[in-house]
Amino acid sequence: MNTQFFEEYQTQLLDWQKKFFSTWMESLPKGTAEIKLTDTFETSLKLQEEMVKSYLEAQEKSATMMIDAQKQFWDNYFQALRQEPVSAN
């Protein structure tokens, strides 16, 4: 069987990882470095809530991308097997 599909899967996995981290970093609230210890409890709580929400959104997107990549991989795998000639003994 051709290793092209496995190489394609590895490429898709790498792309998925890049998209996951870029999505997560983009969704983090801006200006987190400006938060001081003297901020109120409510401000800290809101920041934590935003971070959890953004992390969960990134997880959801990454799970969807990973499932799509796995579907594509297995579709390609079975398609390649169907194209291989069957040897008759």
UniProtKB/Swiss-Prot annotation:
Function (record text): A phasin, it attaches to the polyhydroxybutyrate (PHB) granule surface regulating the number and size of PHB granules within a cell. It probably also acts as a regulator affecting the biosynthetic activity of PHB synthase in vivo.
Descriptive protein name: Phasin PhaP
Note: Nitrogen-free medium induces chlorosis in Synechocystis, leading to the degradation of the photosynthetic apparatus and concomitant accumulation of cytoplasmic polyhydroxyalkanoic acid (PHA) granules which in this cyanobacterium are composed of PHB.
Keywords attached to this entry: Cytoplasm, Membrane, PHB biosynthesis, Thylakoid
Gene: phaP
Region of interest: Helix 1: 3-26
Superkingdom to which the source organism belongs: Bacteria
Result of knocking out the encoding gene: During N(2) starvation fewer PHB granules accumulate per cell, while their diameter is increased by about 25% after 6 days of nitrogen starvation. Decreased rate of PHB synthesis, however overall accumulation of PHB is not significantly different.
GO CC, alphabetical: plasma membrane-derived thylakoid membrane; polyhydroxyalkanoate granule
GO biological process, one term: poly-hydroxybutyrate biosynthetic process
Documented applications: Poly(3-hydroxyalkanoic acids) (PHA), of which PHB is among the most common compounds, are prokaryotic intracellular storage compounds with potential uses as a renewable, biodegradable thermoplastic. Cyanobacterial PHB synthesis is particularly attractive as cyanobacteria use CO(2) as the carbon source.
Origin organism lineage: Bacteria, Bacillati, Cyanobacteriota, Cyanophyceae, Synechococcales
